[in-house]
């Protein structure tokens, strides 16, 4: 044992063991994830216990309870052979974020813009109790009667035309964008008129309550249009949080609007529409089962339509607004595996999916959506020598969010973060570098180098910026949640791989953004 233990200690940085990887278990097997290469390996029980000690306590034990010296020697030999053959557990502690040169960044902003999102209005006809724009949510604007002018909308479309590559998306946001349907329609028509020789697509998110047969017919008739439709499940669950500005539930209007759109799109509804469901606490199997049964019971809703199910935004719902109607009675909401409990939605969806055979079921879609990031993770033969900037996009390249006054933000989720330009002067390269590269890199790199999930991280600017720039206290809280979620995704992925490998084969067809 001492021979292989000594070799391992001489080769890897035991003191920084917490950054080298993590271990996780499914119902049937034990695994390790290697930070440097992105590889995942199945482990024997003894190897698992050694690696768990390394990753969680930064120690390589000389003895393990219940394990003989010979068995421990064999386990260390196996680990050493993997270190040699697969180059695992060998991460440099001082990596730097990949950074575009000024010239590359300038070219991406000028010639490769992918999406422009227009905030048509700050007004909404609803007052969802979990909405980030409610007065009790700091760091975000409140609802207001502000609306985008035609001049701003026109300039935003021209900016999209002039700074995009072979394809570009024009999207609409609010408030509720259908409050300004005539402006939305005028903007779509103008976009189709001036953007030629490119693949042009459109999209908007809606609470569905303002959809009429006429609006649905127009929307469905726009080539390249897609709709993100917000509905939270059956009437009791939906109306607990999604209420009109006067406090009345919105379910009846929302379900009617959804039906109008499905009828207008016809066969194309399954690929042109996405259902977005927000789940609020308490997170019970009773509530999640009710949501599942509701969507599966709508005979007119295409089974193949993508249905997303996710948590309410962090800190956006007040304790006094929480509805306890679907609290359940202590039933299963997350499976515990070696001391790690899968989060409520993930644990519930995984358990239900493993019980079902239908690859088009509601839970199958949720599980597949959460597995794409693990499936497409960065994998290398030898440890990577750099770091991606977590889940952050290249500011001003992936998308630009145009506020009602014409200012550019990174996206619709960044709240009161520093702007990056406007429709009159274009993207501001210096602001982008100052706030979203220099400051982010300087304040984040040390912590990222210490984190085993750094190459799987989905955390982006939206989670950690305020008016003056990055908020590291907020970011570090969100980091913990992301690590937790990432381990859950690893468990789900390898659980499905063990029991329903055909699902993993189909993931290549799932879009990854």
Q: What name fits each language-model region?
A:
Residues 239-255, 259, 263-391, 395, ...:
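Radical SAM enzyme [4Fe-4S]-AdoMet core and its adjacent flexible, acidic
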Residues 3-42, 71-117:
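N-terminal [4Fe-4S]-dependent radical SAM core
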Residues 50, 57-70:
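Short acidic, hydrophobic short linear motifs in intrinsically disordered regions
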Residues 92-112, 374-382, 417-442, 453:
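Short, charged low-complexity linear segments at domain edges
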Residues 153-171, 180-312:
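Radical SAM/AdoMet-radical enzyme domain recognition
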Residues 77-100, 391, 396-430:
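A broadly conserved sequence feature marking short terminus-proximal activation segments
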Residues 4-7, 12-20, 407-408, 413-513:
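Flexible mid-to-C-terminal extensions adjoining Fe-S/redox cofactors in radical SAM and related proteins
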Residues 70-78, 93, 97-217, 222-225:
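Conserved alpha-helical substructure of the radical SAM core
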């Amino acid at each position: 044992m001492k021979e292989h233990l000594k070799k391992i200690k001489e080769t890897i940085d035991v003191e920084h063991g917490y950054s080298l990887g993590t271990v996780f278990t499914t119902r049937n097997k034990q695994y390790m994830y290697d930070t440097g290469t992105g590889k995942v390996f199945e482990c024997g029980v003894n190897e698992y216990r050694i690696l768990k000690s390394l990753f969680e306590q930064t120690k390589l034990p000389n003895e393990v309870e219940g394990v003989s010296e010979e068995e421990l020697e064999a386990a260390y030999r196996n680990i050493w052979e993997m270190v040699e053959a697969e180059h695992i557990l060998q991460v440099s502690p001082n990596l730097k974020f990949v950074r575009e040169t000024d010239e590359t960044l300038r070219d991406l902003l000028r010639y490769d813009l992918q999406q422009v999102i227009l905030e048509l209005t700050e007004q909404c006809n609803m007052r969802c109790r979990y909405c980030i724009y409610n007065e009790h949510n700091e760091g975000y604007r409140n609802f207001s009667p502000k609306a985008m002018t035609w001049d701003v909308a026109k300039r935003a479309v021209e900016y999209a035309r002039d700074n995009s590559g072979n394809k570009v998306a024009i999207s609409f946001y609010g408030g509720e964008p259908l409050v300004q349907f005539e402006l939305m329609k005028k903007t779509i028509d103008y976009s189709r008129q001036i953007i030629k020789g490119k693949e042009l697509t459109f999209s908007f998110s809606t609470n569905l309550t303002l959809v009429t047969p006429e609006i649905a017919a127009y929307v469905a008739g726009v080539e390249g249009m897609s709709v993100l439709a917000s509905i939270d499940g059956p009437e009791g669950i939906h109306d607990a949080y999604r209420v009109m500005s006067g406090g009345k539930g919105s379910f009846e209007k929302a379900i009617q609007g959804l039906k109008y759109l499905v009828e207008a799109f016809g066969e194309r509804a399954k690929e042109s529409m996405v259902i977005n469901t927000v789940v609020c606490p308490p997170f019970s199997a009773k509530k999640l089962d009710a949501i599942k049964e509701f969507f599966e019971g709508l005979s007119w809703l295409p089974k193949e339509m993508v249905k997303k199910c996710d948590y309410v935004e962090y800190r956006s719902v007040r304790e006094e607004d929480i509805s306890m109607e679907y609290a359940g009675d202590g039933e299963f909401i997350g499976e515990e595996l070696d001391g790690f409990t899968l989060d409520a939605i993930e644990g519930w969806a995984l358990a239900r999916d493993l019980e079902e055979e239908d690859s088009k079921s509601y839970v199958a879609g949720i599980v597949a959506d959460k597995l794409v990031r693990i499936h497409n993770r960065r994998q290398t033969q030898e440890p990577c020598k750099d770091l991606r900037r977590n889940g952050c996009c290249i500011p001003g390249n992936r998308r630009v969010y145009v506020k009602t006054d014409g200012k550019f933000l990174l996206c619709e989720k960044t709240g009161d973060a520093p702007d990056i330009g406007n429709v009159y002067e274009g993207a501001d390269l210096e602001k982008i570098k100052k706030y979203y590269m220099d400051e982010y890199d300087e304040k984040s790199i040390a912590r990222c180098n210490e984190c085993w999930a750094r190459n799987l991280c989905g955390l982006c600017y939206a989670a950690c910026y305020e008016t003056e720039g990055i908020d590291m206290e907020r970011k570090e809280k969100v980091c913990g949640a992301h690590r937790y979620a990432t381990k859950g995704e690893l468990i789900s992925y390898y659980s499905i791989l063990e029991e329903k490998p055909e699902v993993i084969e189909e993931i290549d067809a799932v879009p990854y953004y």
